[in-house]
A protein has these predicted regions:
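Bacterial N-terminal signal peptides
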Residues: 18-26
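C-terminal motif of bacterial Sec signal peptides marking the signal peptidase cleavage site
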Residues: 29-30
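Coil residues (strongly favoring Ser/Thr
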Residues: 53, 60, 102-105, 118, ...
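Contiguous beta-strand segments within globular domains
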Residues: 62-73
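Short amphipathic, basic-aromatic surface patches that mediate peripheral association
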Residues: 73-80
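Short coil-to-beta strand junction motifs in C2/discoidin
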Residues: 81-88, 171
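A beta-strand/beta-hairpin structural motif
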Residues: 119-125, 130-143
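Internal, hydrophobic beta-strand segments that form the core of beta-sheet-rich folds
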Residues: 151-165, 170-180
Length: 182
């Protein structure tokens, strides 16, 4: 009898555990439902060299609508970033892809937006507290722009640091995230 009850209990608890896993997995996937693009570039242990221009290509968006463009920065606690701020030059160029209109003629590529901005990223508070999230690496998300993009839009993004020191230690990764806004 005890063995039978243990087997029943084991089956019930296994089903709840499996069901909980499915629910948590679904929620995690649903959180990124509108994630259109994300890519990070890594740097060597020495850091980010000033001559290293990062290039990101966002190719052919699947949905039209409003998007937020974010800069992502990850710093390492193993090799700490020695400054409070990070200044980067952020260049973006968006075009609509060529497409056929209702008369079946090919329409030219259209420039949607081009900009070059210097972004001051605050990584550490005046009190010395990290403003990012994480434990062994700190993640910082810096909002850059809100864009209205058509289906098939393509983007080219270039990022370079504009700090006085030619090599920045402690920067592990820099990337770009594009999310559709609902």
């Amino acid at each position: 009898m005890k063995t039978h009850l243990k087997n029943i209990w084991h089956q019930i608890s296994s089903r709840f555990l499996a069901g909980g896993f499915v629910i948590v997995s679904t929620l995690l996937v649903a959180c990124d439902e509108y994630f259109a693009f994300g890519e990070y570039k890594s740097f060597p242990k020495e850091g980010w060299y000033m001559r290293d221009t990062l290039h990101f290509v966002i190719d052919s968006l699947q949905e039209a609508g409003p998007y937020t463009l974010n800069l992502g920065i990850r710093t390492s606690t193993a090799n700490p970033y020695p400054y409070k701020d990070l200044q980067v030059e952020f260049s973006q160029r968006w075009v609509s892809s060529s497409h056929k209109d209702t008369t079946d003629s090919l329409q030219p590529v259209t420039l949607i937006k081009t900009s070059l901005d210097t972004i001051d990223c605050h990584l550490v508070s005046d009190k010395g507290d990290n403003l990012g999230t994480g434990i062994s690496n700190f993640q910082y998300i810096v909002p850059i722009d809100t864009l209205q993009l058509p289906v098939g839009a393509k983007g080219n993004i270039y990022i370079v640091h504009r700090m006085r020191k030619s090599t920045l230690p402690g920067i592990a990764n820099v990337g770009v995230e594009l999310r559709r806004v609902e």
